[in-house]
C-alpha cells in the first residue's frame, strides 16, 4: 500500500465513501437515541437537584454539543456545571493529567454553589460531586419511566448507563475552562515546528479544556497512602477534546475517521486498550512529523495510515502511550498486560496487510 499512485487514492476514497460513511450514519442515529435518553434522565435529575442543569443541546447541523463518541457502542455525555469562579485552578503536575480546584483566598465556603462538596482543606471534591450525582441518577433509573430500557452500571464510581442493552453512555460532570491553558501543557506547541501555525495554535489554546469528575487510572489503584489517594480522588481530570478537534481538519480528520473504522472492524474486543482516543493521539503526533498540508492529501493518506499503525504497535509493545498535550499522562496506564499484548498482535496483523497487499483496503 505504500507509495503514491491512483490505486491508493481510489482505495482510500472507496473505503471512506462506503465503510466510513456507513459507520458515521449508524453512529449519528445512535447519538440521536443516546441524547434523547440522557436528556430525559437529566430532566428528572434536575427536578431533584437544580444545580445539575441539563446542558446538552442540539446544534443547527443536528449534532449534539456535549456528546463524545468513544466507539459505536460507547458514548459519553458531558454535563457542564456552573459557578467555578470562587475557586483557583491549581495545576502543579502533582497528579498526572489532573488539577484541583481550591477555594480562593478570602472566599468563604458559603459563597460557593457547591458548599457541601468542599473538603476541610478547601478543595472542591470531584469524588463527592460524582457520588451525589450517581445517587440521584440511580434513583431516577429505578422509576418505571426508565427501568425497562436503562440500567446503571456500578462497576466503578463513574455514572455509566446501559441503554437498550446495547449502548453504554457515561454521564460526566465537568467545568468548562475557556481561554486558559494548563501549565502541564505549557511546552506546546513545540518550538521550531511549522505545524500548527501560530494562528491555529492560539485558537487551540483559547479553546481551553474541561475539568471532569471521573475515575482515572490513578484513583482506580489501591493506594496505600491514604492522604495521597484522597487528594487524587478529589482532583479533576483534564480533558482537551475541543482543542484536539480544532487541530484535526481536512485530510487529518479523514485519516482519523478511517482509523476508527479499521479499529472497530479489526481491533475491537471486550476490554480493548485501543480506543478512538489513542488513535486520535497518535494522529496528532503524526501531524508533527508530517507538517505540510500535501502530506495529508489523498495520495499520501495510505502512508499516514501505515505510519500511525506502526506507531500504535510500538506504543503497545512499550506499554506506554503519552497524552498529546499532557505527556506525563500515560493512556495505557493500568491496562491489563494480556489485553495490550493481544492488541499489539491485532495491530501488527492489520498494518502488515496494509504494507504488503496493494489492495488491502478492499478486503478490510
Curated annotation (Swiss-Prot):
Keyword list, A-Z: Developmental protein, Differentiation
Database matches in Gene3D superfamilies: 1.10.1410.40, 3.30.460.90
Induction description: Transcription is repressed by heat shock.
Loss of function: phenotype: In the male tail, ray precursor cells show altered fates. Conical sensory ray 6 is absent as it appears to fuse with ray 4. Males show reduced body length and uncoordinated movement in a backwards locomotion. Hermaphrodites produce a reduced brood size due to a decreased number of laid eggs.
Annotated S-S bridges: none
Highest taxon in the source lineage: Eukaryota
InterPro entries reported in the protein's UniProt record: Mab-21-like_nuc_Trfase, Mab-21_HhH/H2TH-like, MAB21L/cGLR
GO BP, sorted A to Z: cell fate commitment; embryo development ending in birth or egg hatching; nematode male tail mating organ morphogenesis
A UniProt-annotated Pfam family: Mab-21
Family: Belongs to the mab-21 family.
Record function comment: Acts in a cell autonomous fashion to specify the properties of the sensory ray and non-autonomously in the choice of hypodermal versus neuroblast cell fate.
Protein name (Swiss-Prot/TrEMBL): Protein male abnormal 21
Organism: Caenorhabditis elegans
Amino acid at each position: 500500500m505504500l507509495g503514491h499512485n491512483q490505486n491508493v487514492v481510489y482505495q482510500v476514497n472507496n473505503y471512506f465513501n462506503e465503510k466510513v460513511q456507513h459507520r458515521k450514519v449508524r453512529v449519528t442515529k445512535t447519538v440521536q437515541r443516546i441524547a434523547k435518553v440522557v436528556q430525559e434522565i437529566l430532566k428528572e435529575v434536575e427536578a431533584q437537584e437544580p444545580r445539575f442543569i441539563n446542558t446538552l443541546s442540539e446544534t443547527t447541523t443536528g449534532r449534539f454539543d456535549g456528546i463524545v463518541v468513544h466507539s459505536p457502542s460507547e458514548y459519553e455525555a458531558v454535563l457542564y456545571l456552573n459557578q467555578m469562579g470562587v475557586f483557583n485552578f491549581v495545576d502543579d503536575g502533582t497528579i498526572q493529567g489532573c488539577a484541583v480546584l481550591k477555594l480562593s483566598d478570602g472566599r468563604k465556603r458559603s459563597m460557593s454553589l457547591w458548599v457541601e462538596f468542599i473538603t476541610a482543606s478547601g478543595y472542591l471534591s470531584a469524588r463527592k460531586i460524582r457520588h451525589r450525582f450517581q445517587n440521584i441518577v440511580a434513583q431516577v433509573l429505578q422509576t418505571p419511566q426508565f427501568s425497562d430500557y436503562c440500567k446503571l452500571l456500578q462497576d466503578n464510581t463513574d455514572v455509566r448507563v446501559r441503554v437498550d442493552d446495547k449502548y453504554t453512555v457515561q454521564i460526566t460532570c465537568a467545568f468548562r475552562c475557556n481561554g486558559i491553558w494548563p501549565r502541564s501543557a505549557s511546552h506546546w506547541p513545540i518550538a521550531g515546528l511549522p505545524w500548527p501555525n501560530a494562528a491555529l495554535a492560539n485558537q487551540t489554546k483559547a479553546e481551553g479544556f474541561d475539568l471532569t469528575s471521573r475515575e482515572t487510572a490513578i484513583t482506580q489503584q489501591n493506594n496505600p497512602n491514604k492522604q495521597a489517594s484522597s487528594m487524587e480522588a478529589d482532583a479533576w481530570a483534564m480533558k482537551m477534546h475541543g482543542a484536539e478537534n480544532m487541530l484535526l481538519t481536512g485530510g487529518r480528520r479523514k485519516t482519523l475517521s478511517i482509523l476508527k473504522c479499521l479499529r472497530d472492524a479489526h481491533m475491537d474486543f471486550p476490554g480493548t486498550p485501543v480506543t478512538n482516543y489513542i488513535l486520535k493521539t497518535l494522529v496528532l503526533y503524526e501531524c508533527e512529523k508530517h507538517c505540510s498540508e500535501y502530506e495529508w492529501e489523498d495520495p499520501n493518506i495510505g502512508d499516514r495510515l501505515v505510519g500511525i499503525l506502526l506507531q500504535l504497535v510500538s506504543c503497545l509493545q512499550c506499554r506506554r502511550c503519552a497524552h498529546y498535550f499532557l505527556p506525563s499522562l500515560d493512556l495505557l496506564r493500568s491496562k491489563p498486560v494480556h489485553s495490550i499484548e493481544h492488541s499489539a498482535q491485532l495491530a501488527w496483523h492489520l498494518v502488515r496487510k496494509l504494507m504488503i497487499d496493494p489492495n488491502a483496503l478492499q478486503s478490510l
